[in-house]
Amino acid sequence: MKVRASVKKICDKCKVIRRHGVVRVICENAKHKQRQG
């Protein structure tokens, strides 16, 4: 999980979603997981 000021899709499989007001990126590649913080 990377915590970043700006979250971006890294590959085509990445999805940007909002959970409880937190922007997250979920992907089948675990290295691409990010959240905004």
From Swiss-Prot:
Q: Which family does it belong to?
A: Belongs to the bacterial ribosomal protein bL36 family.
Does the keyword Ribonucleoprotein feature in the UniProt annotation?
yes
SUPFAM superfamilies linked? Ribosomal protein L36 (SSF57840)
InterPro entries reported for this sequence: Ribosomal_bL36, Ribosomal_bL36_sp
Protein's UniProt keywords contain Signal: no
Which PANTHER family would you find in this protein's record? Answer: 50S RIBOSOMAL PROTEIN L36, CHLOROPLASTIC, LARGE RIBOSOMAL SUBUNIT PROTEIN BL36C
Q: Which is one GO molecular function term here?
A: structural constituent of ribosome
Instruction: State the gene name recorded for this protein.
Output: rpmJ
Sorted alphabetically, the keyword list is: Ribonucleoprotein, Ribosomal protein
Protein's name in the database: Large ribosomal subunit protein bL36
NCBIfam families, A to Z: rpmJ_bact
Example GO CC term: the record gives:
cytoplasm
TM regions (residue ranges): none
Which biological process, per GO, is one annotated for this protein?
A: translation
